[in-house]
Amino acid sequence: MIYVRGQAADFDGWEAQGCEGWGFNSVMPYFLKCEDQERGVSQYHAVGGPVSVADLPSKEILGEAFHEASKKLGSPYNNDFNGESQVGAGYVQVTTKNARCWSTADGYLKGKIATNITVVTHVMVNSLVLERGQITGVNYSDKSGTYTARATKEVIISAGTFNSPKLLELSGIGNREVLESKDIAVQHELRGVGENLQDHFGIGAQYRASKPVTVNDLSNNVIKGGLALMRYLLFKTGPFANNGNYSNTFINSSQDVDRPDMMITFMGWCTGENLRPRPFSGFTILAEHIRPDCRGTVHVRSDDPREQPIIKFNFLESDADKKAAIEGLKHARKIAQTAPMSGFVAEELKPGSDKVTDEQLLEHCRSEGLSLLHCVGTCKMGVDELSVVDSRLKVHGLKGVRVIDASIMPTIVSGNTNAAAIMIGEKGAQMVIDDWCN
């Protein structure tokens, strides 16, 4: 739901790596094309697109306290993280419409599927059909048997960061050593398939609240929860109209970085064992490293398409990533210790007030850190030896196949990947139209 495009320098960096036509000025029209912005038209926003983007319908007392504390620590208030600059603290924008979640399925599919398309569901795609250097179709199966769908022009892979490289490898397209280790015949050697996995690493500081103003209070009290639900149903405001993650502040983790590389997110709730809400009022301040050094991998587990791939994130493998996580956690703590935020803190639950050294904080990062599920990069766009697709999203060395999803990002964007993934879909669709219809 959170809609943060990233920084202009992210996309200019793509172009600098050889991804022609993917600089910020080139991708901005596709961000605008997809958007139906509640605020209306401006230099950075548009209306009439399929994706509804809105502000949170009500301000929260904890969000206001978070902004004020962040301001005292040097982060100015930012009314629009998708505007001129990402620097500062403010409320996030979300993909909602009338205070309800608005997905890309809502915007692009419902009531809009053309009559000249057949959608097949509940099937497993097993492999691509590769004939004389060209992808000519896909093999798929369901409970009744195995079939082949033939392509007269090209096959578009949009299986996501985990399954797009998996499908290529199942088809014999990838690193020779990986394929041969799984007894898959090499059809087209491409070293970068499944490499370059990137994600945002998050680590939280968790607090018991001194006042009953968090989402936990709604889950732990039937009357409060019921009243909040009625408020939402009648007026589309209140905590049920928000996603629980009210606010962000974007900061530099150190003086060595020239633009924000940490996203600190205020979450108006906290969880305990098995991610169940704690039985008391609490909140979390999550530090997220948004430009990581580490690179992971996604590779097939076997030649059986029904098996899930092997995913290795390699979080905290570099000194830079360790330092950023520690500094981000320290900043989250500083926000909680700064008025007016400090007035809502009864006790630090995690890491705990006794954890003060960098070594202790790093151990907390290792034991409590998590993936933010912003996974990208495993079919990297570019011109180097580990790139998988070119700037037109066509797989290197093959005809008749493109990859159009978040896996093509050469480097992860500095924010939630939702908006950038939608932009890639829009730009990729236009490339297909340009190549076949013009």
Describe these PLM feature segments.
Residues M1-E15, G172:
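Periplasmic solute-binding protein
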Residues Y30, L128, G137-A228, L233, ...:
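Glycine-rich loop(s) and the adjacent beta-strand/alpha-helix scaffold that form part
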Residues G23-S26, N163-E189, K322-E327, N418-E426, ...:
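Classical protein tyrosine phosphatase
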Residues M28, C34-G83, G90-Y91, S210-V213, ...:
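FAD-dependent oxidoreductase catalytic-site/capping-region signature
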Residues N78, T118-V120, A185-E189, T265:
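General small-molecule cofactor/ligand-binding pocket signal
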Residues E15-I135, N139-S141, G204-G226:
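Conserved redox-cofactor binding core of oxidoreductases
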